[in-house]
Amino acid sequence: MNSVSFEDVAVNFTLEEWALLDSSQKKLYEDVMQETFKNLVCLGKKWEDQDIEDDHRNQGRNRRGHMVERLCESRKGSKCGETTSQMPNVNINKETSTGAKPHECSFCGKDFMHHSSLNRHMRSHIGQKPNEYQEYEKQPCKRKAVGKTFSYRHCVRKHERTHTGGKPYECKQCGKAFIYYQPFQRHERIHAGEKPYECKQCGKTFIYYQSFQKHAHTGKKPYECKQCGKTFICYQSFQRHERTHTGEKPYECKQCGKAFSCPTYFRTHERTHTGEKPYKCKECGKAFSFLSSFRRHKRTHSGEKPYECKECGKAFFYSASFQAHVITHTGARPYKCKECGKAFNSSNSCRVHERTHIGEKPYECKRCGKSFSWSISLRMHERTHTGEKPYECKQCHKTFSFSSSLREHETTHTGEKPYECKQCGKAFRFSSSLQRHERTHSAEKPYECKQCGKAFRCSSYFRIHERSHTGEKPYECKQCGKVFIRSSSFRLHERTHTGEKPYECKLCGKAFSFSSSLREHEKIHTGNKPFECKRCGKAFLRSSQIRLHERTHTGEKPYQCKQCGKAFISSSKFRMHERTHTGEKPYRCKQCGKAFRFSSSVRIHERSHTGEKPYECKQCGKAFISSSHFRLHERTHMGEKA
């Protein structure tokens, strides 16, 4: 008897003919083709296994054969017991270049080119998973049923690799290996810069089809959550959302046990263990673990600020900064801490705050072992080891380790103060400064030290205070080895080596190393002394001066020398005294190399080289190097004895 192939008995339609059939006729056609195929299988016909996951390898593969394979996979089993992994390479529907999609989903109305695609899609509605995975032990006859089910047989084969650890697809450029071909193919696009999916409406291109689908201008969101009614463009987003209701976290890290609801979050987390940085900047060569970080970094080169506020026109590099800014107009704080009820204007700030309750610090520095509550803090900390300063000011070309430091610096050029207190009208350069200021009105101190109970308005002050208990000094000067508790103190100290004076008085042109010194100096021009002692009425230029002065009334001397027991009103005098014991002379003259205990002493000494005499007597015109010599001279006019 001559062999009969499926092609011999199959009935074919063109797309035009198929479009003329009604739904009952299409259903009848499907049933007949399925029954025909069952009969051929029962006659003992066998075909080579078609590995569906490698469909991409044969670009000319007949789509109709693919459709039959899917169609036949959907049945629960054949009567004669033949395995359905043996599929024919046959034709059912002919595909034309018209782009017509004749198959419509009766649930959501989505259209498909092939019946097999519709069939697969329908399973997302009804939850059908006919293929069951069974894990085999070493003995061929003995098996233990895991019971995990899959919609398609090729998914079973893919799943088996998660048990065997097989990763057959390896990137030739970076050596990364993949279980499945599709992720491997997507990964290769990162190196090539290929973006094959282009939006016909706006021309924007995408590496991944899923990103392209999400971008679509149709506004169609066919996937609706039954619990909250939220709708989604793509099924994967819908699936991820459902897990927020169920709390399911199916992706678990084998190294630390942390679980994730989304595979992308899981893969990103894995890089914290492996140190993998697959995203490399072509301009500066810097590599990144995360695509989002890479995209943000590219904006530092291009200057692009894609997020613009519609109310005030201010533009931002990052969506998080933009969202936080938008809320400053409304005053809304929609994110509330479940433990203490504190509200925040961003979800990120809320998550970070919640870690202060549980003490979680999942990010650890590989160099020094210090751990952090969030990844950005770890990355910022790592720069203290590497000295990296990736953020550059376009006006003066000064570089910074942190984007926040760059933004703060940029306001020194513009003078902009966009954040205004609604209670007193005071304006600030930074939202964090405004938040701290607002607490002076509310007296709120949300950060409490567990060791001594002292509370703080600001998280940064709280962290610095904690170091007074631990003795930690994470900031080390590479030139002299001196260590500091605060990054601000460290940066100020660096200027003693560089001689940098970035703060200039607009009235007289005098420059200062520190902004506080400039502010104090400016008060000399205005004569303003805003800080008045309530006991004696004496007024001061600076708040620090009045605090020290008040101690002369109370007798408080909080700084005591451990070696000799002598106590001091101020920390600066205490530190100066300590040097009499240690012999430390950290301030060195650049011209002659002479070292001094105090910065004031080296400044006075340097004038002996420059000839500068800034203190001039108004009565006789004589000038002096130091203020102390000048004061002694003044007494000669007054008849005083020194």
Curated annotation (Swiss-Prot):
Xref: PROSITE patterns: KRAB, ZINC_FINGER_C2H2_1, ZINC_FINGER_C2H2_2
Keyword Metal-binding attributed: yes
Annotated keywords: DNA-binding, Metal-binding, Nucleus, Repeat, Transcription, Transcription regulation, Zinc, Zinc-finger
Record's protein name: Zinc finger protein 14
Subcellular location: Nucleus
Chief location category: nucleus
The keyword rRNA processing appears for this protein: no
Gene from which the chain derives: ZNF14
GO molecular function list: DNA binding; zinc ion binding
GO cellular component, one term: nucleus
Region (Disordered) location: 77-99
A matching Pfam family: zf-C2H2
Species: Macaca fascicularis
Record domain KRAB: where: 4-76
Bias (Polar residues) ranges: 81-99
Zinc fingers typed C2H2-type, residue spans: 103-125, 141-163, 169-191, 197-217, 223-245, 251-273, 279-301, 307-329, 335-357, 363-385, 391-413, 419-441, 447-469, 475-497, 503-525, 531-553, 559-581, 587-609, 615-637
Any single GO BP term: regulation of DNA-templated transcription
Function: May be involved in transcriptional regulation.
Family recorded in the similarity comment: Belongs to the krueppel C2H2-type zinc-finger protein family.
